[in-house]
């Protein structure tokens, strides 16, 4: 199956490979984003940490798509108050959702609202690493 990756500016990406995965959905107020948060489709949303420029539109998109947000336990406790499904994990933890496996890995970043981590997502023998450096190993 073909994998399609779209950069949404800043740290935001979509990965489509039979399922639509959205990472760090920051659309509103992002001059580099070419889409509006209201129009974004996602089956699964991954948020690396609680800064507005990473978590910005996660709740809005999750509600529009009835999709869960994968994030740290601490951030999950806040997001749940918005009546959105969350899947919490911490560094080293792996979640599985509709055939997608994402593993949270520790990452260093200044002053995050709550803990932060990046995700390894193996898709068809490809590994995608989302961090402040975007690395795709094929």
Model region roles, listed by residue range:
Residues 9-11, 71-77, 91:
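Short, polar loop motifs at secondary-structure junctions
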Residues 43, 67-74:
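Short internal beta-strands
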Residues 104-138:
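Active-site-proximal loop/helix segment associated with metal-binding centers of metalloenzymes
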Residues 1-3, 16-21, 94-102:
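Beta-strand-turn-beta hairpins that frame and shape the catalytic cleft
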Residues 68, 80-94:
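Binuclear metal-ion centers of metallo-dependent hydrolases, dominated by the metallo-beta-lactamase
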């Amino acid at each position: 199956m073909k994998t399609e990756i779209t950069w949404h500016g800043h740290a935001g990406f979509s990965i489509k490979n039979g399922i639509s995965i959205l990472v760090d959905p920051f659309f509103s107020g992002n001059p580099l984003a070419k889409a509006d948060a209201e129009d974004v489709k996602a089956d699964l949303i991954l948020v690396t940490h609680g800064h507005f420029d990473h978590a910005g539109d996660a709740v809005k998109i999750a509600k529009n798509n009835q999709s869960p947000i994968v994030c740290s336990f601490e951030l999950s406790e806040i997001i749940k108050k918005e009546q959105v499904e969350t899947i919490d994990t911490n560094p080293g933890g792996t979640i599985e959702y509709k055939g997608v496996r994402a593993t949270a890995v520790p990452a260093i970043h200044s002053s995050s609202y709550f803990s932060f981590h990046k995700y390894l997502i193996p898709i068809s023998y490809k590994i995608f690493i989302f961090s402040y450096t975007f690395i795709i190993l094929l």
